[in-house]
């Protein structure tokens, strides 16, 4: 059972598609013990919902600002969100 202190929806813009951003996000989120999902958007952005302890979410948001090698992040927008059900893992969705 996972205990989530909060969940945040994050929209990352810039050169973030075609550089492995979703796979990098999943790997970083798993390392931090976060759950949720990440997907590419039609407009070229990447959107993720991350759930877990405040400190891990803050760390992940800072990592989003840098991104993986090959990415060039121009903006990271966050907003608190409510989850319909607690995710038990971190997934890449389409």
From Swiss-Prot:
Instruction: Give the Enzyme Commission number.
Output: 3.6.1.7
Q: Do you know which InterPro entries this protein is assigned to? A: Acylphosphatase (IPR020456), Acylphosphatase-like_dom (IPR001792), Acylphosphatase-like_dom_sf (IPR036046), Acylphosphatase_CS (IPR017968)
Q: Please name the source species.
A: Rhizobium johnstonii (strain DSM 114642 / LMG 32736 / 3841)
Family, according to the entry, reads as follows: Belongs to the acylphosphatase family.
Residues of the Acylphosphatase-like domain:
7-94
Q: Which domain of life is it from?
A: Bacteria
Where is the sequence biased in composition, kind Polar residues?
71-85
Please state what class of enzyme this protein is: hydrolase
Q: Encoded by which gene?
A: acyP
Tell me what this protein is called: Acylphosphatase
Instruction: Enumerate the UniProt keywords alphabetically.
Output: Hydrolase
Which reaction does this enzyme catalyse, per its entry? an acyl phosphate + H2O = a carboxylate + phosphate + H(+)
